[in-house]
């Protein structure tokens, strides 16, 4: 769509005439899904900048293992990238499709999902690098496009794939699983 292409190319976006009833966190996540580096500004009806947004997440951040449901992958993906201090060292469990990238090391793959921010034309593949540990000895597992349930410790590393710092998930367990009812989030 025209709007999605504009957001992908923009450095900043301003939402004006915002009210307390609006889900500003949802707007922010939608924009960040299209353009991770975009600066977002919210203004109230008087034109004053609103500092902070309600960034509550739909999963328990206090749990020993953060359980990300199939529908909440997109929220987690963006929040994990945007708030490294909240996630660094935490353990997460989620379902994703394994993608093999020849640029990655043999013990690495990408845990990915397709996300749609606006309409079918805007579907994009997103994911984070997963490092397999000594517990997972088969170099070919998981196979390309195999659906897996991953439990991993979240770390942050400087990586070329991210053009800087980004989440790298150190796998504790990887289990083959059924694909989700809705493959696109």
Where are the model-predicted features located?
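OB-fold and OB-like single-stranded nucleic-acid-recognition modules
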Residues: 3, 7-185
């Amino acid at each position: 769509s025209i709007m999605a292409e504009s957001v992908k190319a923009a450095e900043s976006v301003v939402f004006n005439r915002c009210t307390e009833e609006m889900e500003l966190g949802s707007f922010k996540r939608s924009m960040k899904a299209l353009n991770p580096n975009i600066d977002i500004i919210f203004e109230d009806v008087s034109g004053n900048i609103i500092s902070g947004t309600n960034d509550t997440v739909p999963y328990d951040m206090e749990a020993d293992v953060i359980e990300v449901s199939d529908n909440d992958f997109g929220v987690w993906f963006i929040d994990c990238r945007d708030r490294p201090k909240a996630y660094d060292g935490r353990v997460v469990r989620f379902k994703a499709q394994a993608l093999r990238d020849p640029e990655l090391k043999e013990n690495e793959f990408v845990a990915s999902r397709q996300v749609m921010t606006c309409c079918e034309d805007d579907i994009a593949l997103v994911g984070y690098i997963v490092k397999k540990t000594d517990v997972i000895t088969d170099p070919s597992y998981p196979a390309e496009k195999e659906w897996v349930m991953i439990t991993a410790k979240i770390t942050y590393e400087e990586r070329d794939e991210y053009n800087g710092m980004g989440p790298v998930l150190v796998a504790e367990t990887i289990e083959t699983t059924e694909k989700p009812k809705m493959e696109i989030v």
